[in-house]
Amino acid sequence: MPTFYESRQLVTPGDLLAEGKYIAGDNTYKENDKIYATRVGLVNYERRKIHVTALKAFYVPRVGDLVVGKVAEIGTGGWMVDINAPHLAVLRASDVLDRPFRPQKNDLVSLFDAGDLLIAKIVAYDRTRDPMLTVREPGLGKVTHGLVVEITPTKIPRIIGRKGSMINMLKRETECRITLGQNGLILINGKTLEDEQIAAMAIRKIEKESHTSGLTDRVTEMVRKEKGGVEHTSKEE
């Protein structure tokens, strides 16, 4: 009676968890003596009973995804980064430095310290190991300024809109540079603090009303109203 995942391993809907005389618990179902997951979460085995602890707001990494993460730990050969996933991601020093990494000579803290925000790309992930990151591409690396907004990762496609209509409107109307992390973290860089805050308000509105029609027009109207009624403060003051 085999099981196909280790306890506390991440599973997704439709994954075959076990086969044989097991009992289907929370977020699982049984069909033809096989137990499958119905939710994204962590699988648990309690003797003959199998259940999945759902992870509602967590992000499931995919190779190629752009993410915004926070450095959680510094190791001997790199950093552990919180990307809003069930497990921390790994950023190796060799994926940052343009020379061979030498622990005795290279001070990792001088590059990225705990608490630093990073824009990175996922280069490896297969659910049997922690996600691997890189920052060795244009536009990636340490975040030095801007406003970060966190939303439910599954709402990112709504922020983008059909053929990029929503995100392009936001950038145009708020005059902000907006970096969308597929993990639900969004970096906003504007000319003024007010512009960044207006962009953040718009993103929150999209997240809250993502199921409604006519949203692009309503968000556009809100942004224009807010932009027309505030005094702008330079970010350098």
Question: Which residues fall in each region the model found?
Answer:
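Single-stranded RNA-binding regions, centering on S1/OB-family and related RNA-binding modules
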Residues: 1-119, 123-237
